């Protein structure tokens, strides 16, 4: 069976559209400069990573060996001994966050999840799906959690086992919650570290902070219990995916033996994409530490360039420390639609992902924003 000429033409038209718009993205955190051509031959196979990559699986076409090496890499990156960790390649950041919240709920079934107003919208869905108690915490103007409000609400709830959802780079403002302050503040309430759970959503910044000179606290050495990072954001992937890493002793609590695949399952989803672990493996094996560092540095420099250009025109643009997200006043609908910007209330942002090898798209956006805001002020 073959496609009709009409259907083939439809695919050809979509191909041309994708080629034309491959590097369009300036408003969302996805890097488009990836090349997984070497993996194209594997697309003829149904590769399924159901279950635990650390065990034998009766489904032979899996990429477990590659997934294991991916997890070794991220355990090292996030400062936890590999043998004390467990995680997997997820379908994206939301699944990683759900996994972290699920672990927290299983450890503290009656605990309350605390997350800030700047937290990704998916967490509200996770709260409903897990049927977990939750409390919304105020945010500071820069997008960081309001730590005083967090403590006030833990005290108000008389919560003895809080489950903390910390943002390591918020979606809109790129803010990083200070997990050192969070832990110190909870300690001052008389709650011991073993009596609460701390998950870190590092969807974008999880591949930035390990490669900068002065990172904010974010990893296991700094006190977290689990962390999620996206694969299609700073790394880049044609298929949305992510990586979640947690403490093995906590994951063992949710392990279930599945007889018909002859394996244990600890994951959220059953069947899992076996191609994305190959992509993440190729990405980490083909980039040295220094190459990642230069890639991140270039993006941070481009973000600062955008801030400087905005500010030189009298526009109140800014970014958080170690963030490639540049926040500025929301322009008119015509401008934000033209440049496919993400907007929230009275602000918009651009994200200086790694495929911006020069400033041309950023300059074009800034020129339009400057002209637009002048027009609005006239």
Swiss-Prot record:
<comment type="similarity">
    <text>Belongs to the group II decarboxylase family.</text>
</comment>
<feature type="modified residue" description="N6-(pyridoxal phosphate)lysine">
    <location>
        <position position="233"/>
    </location>
</feature>
<dbReference type="GO" id="GO:0030170">
    <property type="term" value="F:pyridoxal phosphate binding"/>
</dbReference>
<keyword id="KW-0663">Pyridoxal phosphate</keyword>
<dbReference type="InterPro" id="IPR015421">
    <property type="entry name" value="PyrdxlP-dep_Trfase_major"/>
</dbReference>
<keyword id="KW-0210">Decarboxylase</keyword>
<dbReference type="InterPro" id="IPR002129">
    <property type="entry name" value="PyrdxlP-dep_de-COase"/>
</dbReference>
<protein>
    <recommendedName>
        <fullName>Histidine decarboxylase</fullName>
        <ecNumber>4.1.1.22</ecNumber>
    </recommendedName>
</protein>
<dbReference type="InterPro" id="IPR023523">
    <property type="entry name" value="Hist_deCOase_bac"/>
</dbReference>
<dbReference type="InterPro" id="IPR015424">
    <property type="entry name" value="PyrdxlP-dep_Trfase"/>
</dbReference>
<keyword id="KW-0456">Lyase</keyword>
<dbReference type="InterPro" id="IPR051151">
    <property type="entry name" value="Group_II_Decarboxylase"/>
</dbReference>
<dbReference type="Pfam" id="PF00282">
    <property type="entry name" value="Pyridoxal_deC"/>
</dbReference>
<comment type="subunit">
    <text>Homotetramer.</text>
</comment>
<dbReference type="InterPro" id="IPR021115">
    <property type="entry name" value="Pyridoxal-P_BS"/>
</dbReference>
<dbReference type="GO" id="GO:0019752">
    <property type="term" value="P:carboxylic acid metabolic process"/>
</dbReference>
<dbReference type="GO" id="GO:0004398">
    <property type="term" value="F:histidine decarboxylase activity"/>
</dbReference>
<feature type="binding site">
    <location>
        <position position="120"/>
    </location>
    <ligand>
        <name>substrate</name>
    </ligand>
</feature>
């Amino acid at each position: 069976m073959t496609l009709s000429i009409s259907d083939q033409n439809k695919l050809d038209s979509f191909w041309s559209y994708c080629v034309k718009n491959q590097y369009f993205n300036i408003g969302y955190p996805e890097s488009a400069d990836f090349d997984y051509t070497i993996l194209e031959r594997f697309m003829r196979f149904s590769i399924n990573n159901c279950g635990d990559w650390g065990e034998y699986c009766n489904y032979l076409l899996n990429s477990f060996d590659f997934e294991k090496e991916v997890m070794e890499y991220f355990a090292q990156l996030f400062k936890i001994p590999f043998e004390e960790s467990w995680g997997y390649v997820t379908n994206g950041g939301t699944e990683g966050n759900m996994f972290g919240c699920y672990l927290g709920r299983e450890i503290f079934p009656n605990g309350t999840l605390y997350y800030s107003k700047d937290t990704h919208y998916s967490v509200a869905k996770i709260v409903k799906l897990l049927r977990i108690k939750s409390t919304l915490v105020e945010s500071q103007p820069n997008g960081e959690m309001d730590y005083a409000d967090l403590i006030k609400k833990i005290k108000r709830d008389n919560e003895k086992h809080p489950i903390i959802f910390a943002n390591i780079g918020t979606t809109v403002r790129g803010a990083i919650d200070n997990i050192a302050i969070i832990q110190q503040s909870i300690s001052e309430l008389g709650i011991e570290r073993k009596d609460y759970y701390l998950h870190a959503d590092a969807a974008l910044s999880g591949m930035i902070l390990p490669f900068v000179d002065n990172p904010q606290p974010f990893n296991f050495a700094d006190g977290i219990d689990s962390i999620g990072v996206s694969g299609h954001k700073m790394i880049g992937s044609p298929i949305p995916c992510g990586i979640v890493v947690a403490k093995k002793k906590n994951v063992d609590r949710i392990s279930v033996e599945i007889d018909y695949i002859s394996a244990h399952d600890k994951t959220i989803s059953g069947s899992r994409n076996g191609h994305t672990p190959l992509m993440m493996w190729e990405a980490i094996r083909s980039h040295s530490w220094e190459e990642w560092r230069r890639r991140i540095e270039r993006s941070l420099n481009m973000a600062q360039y955008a801030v400087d250009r905005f500010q030189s025109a009298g526009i109140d643009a800014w970014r958080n420390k170690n963030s490639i997200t540049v926040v500025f006043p929301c322009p008119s609908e015509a401008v934000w639609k033209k440049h496919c910007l993400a907007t929230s209330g009275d602000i918009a942002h651009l994200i200086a992902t790694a495929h911006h090898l020069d400033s041309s798209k950023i300059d074009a956006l800034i020129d339009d924003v400057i002209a637009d805001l002048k027009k609005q002020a006239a």
